[in-house]
Amino acid sequence: MDVVRTLILCVCLFGLTFAVPCIDGVCTSNELQCASGYVKGCHAGLCTCEHATTQSCTVVNNCLHLGTCSLHGRDGFWHCVDSVCKCFFF
């Protein structure tokens, strides 16, 4: 059991060591490359890839007609954030 805990700790530390930081909610690093259908985003000071559409929007409910979406295996809904429809789950 201790081997599993040690392995999990090593994976977490490895991820934090090579994580790309962001400032003021903006991820400008070229080190993070997101797959098609994803855009760079900043969460808790780290750059992440967020599921997004190419559809622009102006208010939160502009994206609700897109229906449900999936992010990291969890179902969510589209919301307008930073003028782009992004997938969020709550």
Swiss-Prot record:
One of its GO terms (molecular function) is serine-type endopeptidase inhibitor activity. The keyword Secreted applies. Contains 6 disulfide bonds. Disulfide bonds: none annotated. Detected in hemolymph (at protein level). In oysters collected in the summer the expression level is highest in the digestive gland with low levels of expression in gill, mantle, labial palp, style-sac midgut, gonad, heart, and hemocyte. In winter expression levels are higher in all tissues with highest expression levels observed in the digestive gland. Within the digestive gland expression is limited to the basophil cells of the digestive diverticula. It comes from the Eukaryota. The keyword Secreted applies. Keywords: Antimicrobial, Disulfide bond, Protease inhibitor, Secreted, Serine protease inhibitor, Signal. Residues 1-19 form the signal peptide. It is found in: Secreted. One of its GO terms (cellular component) is extracellular space. Slow-binding inhibitor of serine proteases. The inhibitor rapidly binds to the protease forming a weak enzyme-inhibitor complex, and this is followed by a slow isomerization forming a tight-binding enzyme-inhibitor complex. Active against subtilisin A, perkinsin and trypsin with dissociation constants of 0.29 nM, 13.7 nM and 17.7 nM respectively. Not active against thermolysin, papain or pepsin. Has antiparasitic activity against the protozoan P.marinus. This is Serine protease inhibitor Cvsi-1.
